[in-house]
Every structure is written in C-alpha cells, then in structure tokens.
Amino acid sequence: MHTPSLTLERIYPPQLDANNEDDRETLRIHLERYDFAATRLTGARVLDMACGCGYGSDRLAELNPDKTIVGVDIDPAAIAFAQAHYQRPNLTYICADAESFRSEEKFDCIVSLETIEHLPRPRQLIENCAALLADGGQIIASVPVTPTLDGNPHHLHDFSTRSFFALFRPYGLLPQERYEQIQWWQFKGLFQRRPSKLHRSEGVGNAVLAYYRKNPLYLLRRLASMLRYGFSNRYLTCRFRSPSV
C-alpha cells in the first residue's frame, strides 16, 4: 500500500518522524483528542466523520469494543489506507462526502475532529451530522481556535470559541464539556526548501510569508494572537448535546 505524500491536510502516522519534535507533538495531540472522545461515547453506533486514514477510528474501536464504529472519508486513498492498516471486528469504513453522507440507521454519537475548518460549507456538515444523530445523541467535534489560514493551505476558515459554538446552536446542540490543547511552534526547518519534505511542517514559513503578501491584513490577526497566546496554536474539542437530555 502506497503512503500518500506529506501534506498538512491529513495525518498518516507511518509518515511521522519519531525523532522530530513537531511530528511527535502533532500525533500526540491528535490522539489525545480521540482519547477524549473515546471515553465519552454513548450508545451502540458511533460515526467518525471525516476519519482520514483511520488511525483515530481505530482508537475509538480499540477502546470501545462493545460499540460499532463507522469511519467515513471523501478520499478513496485514505479509506484504502485505513482498510489496509486499521481494521478491527467492530470497525468499518465508507468512502463518502461528509456533507452528504446518508445512513438508514442513526448514530448515537458522531465524532468529527479537525474537520470543520477544512470544508467550504461548515454549516452543511453540522446540518448533516444533526440529521444523522439519533434522539438524545451527542456530537464531539474540534477546531483550531487561533489563526491557521496563513500556515495551512487546507484550512478555509478560522474559528473562535464563540463562532464554533454558534455552528451547533441552531440544531439545539449546546456545549456540555470542553477540552483545550496547546501546541507550541517548532521553528526548525520553518523556511527549508527541498524537493520533498522530511516532516509535515517543513517549509511552512515560506507559505506563511506568501499568504501575507496576498492577505496583508491577516498579519494583524496573527500578531494579535501571538501577543495574547505566544508562539502557539490552540485547539478546542467539545461535546455537544441537547440540554434537555
């Protein structure tokens, strides 16, 4: 099975360098989000929406052998990788668009981590998740809550805590529990240029400068974030549920 090239769009654990601090931290915080979700799953059927290459779905299935886990992703290569590398008796994968995926059976819990900022129509994803959710079900989702558009070309939206919560409110889903994470920047290789990357974040500084040339006002947003939070990216994972449940 061919491992796709290094990008900032999806994480493939076999690509990550255990000797690189940024790679180690990236995998750690992603797995910690899944661990947060895994210990809060409810009901029998769980959907991992936009599951990527499947390492997170595998984590959910491993820690919840009594539940059926379904991983959905739009990328056929990611689903093929998941099927080849992350299989368990209670885990299946489907190649489908997160914004339009349908299922005859509802899901008791839907997990979608670091997905919303990648999509052109975030509200359409939340609307679809709400439609797929069983009565009394919950959604566990995450987004970055510091600027990321300058450093990651696959991110289409920035969110604050308030704007993140606002996506779910029209569907009667309110935040019940939150989990915050910090990832400090690693500067090694930030402006490196090579034909092929040695790690995911290599050369990101070049993309950042190019972004500011096209979007100079965004630099003010970045500076404001740096003054408040330092050289870090911050992430928020939240469990949403109807308050009447």
Range-by-range predicted roles:
Residues 144-149, 181-184:
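Short "lid" loop at the C-terminus of a central beta-strand within the Rossmann-like core
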Residues 151-156:
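Short, solvent-exposed loop/turn segments at secondary-structure boundaries
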Residues 114-118:
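A short His-aromatic
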Residues 137-143:
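Conserved beta-strand signature within the Rossmann-like core of class I S-adenosyl-L-methionine
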Residues 1-105, 109, 113, 123-126, ...:
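Conserved N-terminal segment of class I S-adenosyl-L-methionine
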